[in-house]
Amino acid sequence: MGKIVINCLSLVLLISANFAAAQSIDTGRGELSLTVPAGYEASTPAPLVLLLHGYGRNAGAEQDAYMKFSALATNYGYLFAAPNGQRETQGNQAWFWNASDACCNFQGSQISDVDYLMTIISKIKSQYNVDGNRVYLIGHSNGGFMAYRTAFENSQEIAAVASLTGAGATVAGPAPLNPVHILHIHGTDDNAFAYEGGDLRGNSYPSAVETVERWAGYNGCDIDGSEVAQLDLDRNLPGLDSIVVRYDNSCKAGGSAELWTITDGAHIPALSDSFSTTVVEWLMAHPKIASTSTD
């Protein structure tokens, strides 16, 4: 019996050692769940990934259930959180981010979500050993708008942004102080935020191409992109449904831009089994500066 108990205990320890653990931090808007990768050691800097949800009834946890980035935390060794934005007090009572003129602060909130996200990053850094060259933002729809704004205003902190359907600001501003790697993913049949750009409640938003070329310019890259690959990003579309266009010539160190166009892709694509892994691997390959830095 003693041997059986010991073997069972060993099995439990082995299983737990291979799965990420859920911790929590106080963000000022309540407790935020933080996924800590199995094997995390305070002596080794870990990347940090924040996932920003879209506008609607679903918030951070539901966004992660759709995109499944927390499930990859242990394999790639990153800390992960999917915070909630603000919630409307009237009408749909939807969750939203105060991101841009176009999307999606429809009730005129004066609360800064940029400050909130930077507070989250700061608090995680105060409790965990975060690699300062590998702080990443992923956003979907309104969350993509929010990721772009946060990176623009805090380019010294954010290494890269991956946005699914969320566009840049309505009006282009001067370049941020530091380069930021940009990955924009957009379906050509998006009926919420058109691939070609458009207007939402009287406020325009740029097209997918304009968003990427704007950031390519910010990063000092040539704005003539090159088609370099095809990907399978939507399981409901046949074959290699997405075209990769890369802007990485003459870029400043720590900056680049890339557009993944999902041909016939919708606003909420049926993500392929490889989607999240492909995005994470792209992020991890794009640190703010050389990964050997001790900053």
PLM regions: where:
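The conserved beta1-alpha1 loop
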Residues: 50-54, 186-187, 263
